[in-house]
Structure formats: structure tokens, C-alpha cells
């Protein structure tokens, strides 16, 4: 490890049972790092225990992990941001392996992969979490062409340029998915780091609701699909309209050639409407695709200018 600054950032909600051990473990593994705990309206002694164990404690009143991460990214300045949950499910022993590629300039985001070595399948006791992770991985691979080993992990390290140019849109547990999609779409360098996983200790409860938060994650993927890949998104929408329009219209066309009449005029009008919506969706996709490309070019120029002249200039860090 070099002398560059590391911030261990821990979003917390009612983690009094485990937060003390988590802080101690990261102080042991990364003695040069500053540990930040952001208390998100905890009703237990999370903030008091975190303070007693030497963490810098701050408070975020807007409920939700995404809201906490947004504020952490705005508040904290560091060369490497190591984000971890406060539930003691992620090993501090992997911290150096996650931070090293960030600090030596070979990655912009490292991802703590719980799945490759099988420990998540062995330790996780919550139904459908593994299925949900695989579903999200498959969706991201289909849309963006990148295969994450573990897309939902809460243990990852990020560079300063990545953090300071990442627009947090989500409010809750969609943040991990949003981080992953942003990294892929903006071509940041990503490195998977296999880690051991352990389930929450007895008495510690997960804040993640499998069904409602799962729906929010899928909705976030759809929203970012529309924003980042508008041509592909609206082409699929146009295809759906075309299928319905043709299913309604072909029998009417056949009947017209046979009889010279259009007896089901309302159905014909509906079929024509669906075909019009098909064309409109395609046009929308082409227009928004042009807008998205211009925005992406501008984003790249802004990041490049900051690397060259601004906050990210660092002789020890390679440009993207």
C-alpha cells in the first residue's frame, strides 16, 4: 500500500450489534485509513458505539442506502473509497486486495465477489437472494454485454474520479446495481476480487426486503436501460407494438383482398394505431440515442479535463 488516502465508508441503519467489530477489523487491516460511519436514522446505539471505536460518525436523515451513499460521496475526499456494510458479513482481510488496484491505477472500481468461491451459497440463509443476484447479472449482461461475477455485493472499492463523477439516482438498495451499470456504461475499469462471505451473526437482521427491493432493482435497471441505451430500449418497444399491430391487421388485410371490404373498421384503426406507435417509438429511439451520445461525449470531455487540469491529477495514478 502507498501513502495515498483511503476512506472506509460504512452506511448504517441499526447495526449496534456488529458495527464495533467492523470498525476494529478495518482499523487493524488499514491503519492508515479513515473510517466513516453514516448513521441513517438508527434507533439503537449504532452511532455511540461507532464513536467509541474511533470512527468518524455523521448522520443522514433521508432514509435509504442510496441517499446515504450520495451524501458520503459528496462529503468525503479520498484517493480510494472502500464501501462496506456494517453487518460484519464482509471480511476486512480482503480490504487490501480491493484497494490495491485502485491505488496503483489499474482499476476504477473493484468488486468484492462473494459468489465465485461458493461461500455466499453456503452462508446465505435468505430465500431468493441468490436467484435475484443471478437475474440481475443476466439482465446486465444481455443489455450491456458485461458479465459481473457478483453485481449485488456491498463490498467494493472505487477511485476518486469514479466517485466524484457518479450521479447517484437511487434512494435505496438499488445503489449497488446503479454503481455496476454506471461503471459498465461509462467504460470504467472494473476488477472482480473473490472474497469470503459470512452470514449475519445471530440477532442481526437484514434490512433488505427481497420482494419490494427486488422490484425496485429491476425498475432501476429498466430506467437506466432507457437512459443509457435508448435505441435498443425503444426498438424493443417498437417490436412489441409491431407484433400487436400485425396480429390485428393481417387478418383484416387478408379479408380485404378476399372480399374487397373492411367490415371490422375499429380493429383496422386499432392495428394502424399500433403500427403508428411502432414508428414513433423507433423515431424516439434514434433521437434519444443521438442525445445520449452527445451527453456521453461531454461527460468524457469533462472527466478528461479534470484528469488533466483539475482535482484528479495525480502522478501516481494512470489516466483512464
Regions found by a protein language model. Name each.
Residues 15-18, 42, 65, 91:
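Donor nucleotide-sugar binding loop of glycosyltransferases
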Residues 39-47:
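A conserved acidic beta->alpha catalytic loop
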Residues 14-28:
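Short, well-formed alpha-helical segments that are part of the catalytic scaffolds
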Residues 61-75, 80, 92-173, 199-215, ...:
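Acceptor/aglycone-binding surface of glycosyltransferases and processive sugar-polymer synthases
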Residues 1-2, 170-320:
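Hydrophobic helical membrane-anchoring modules
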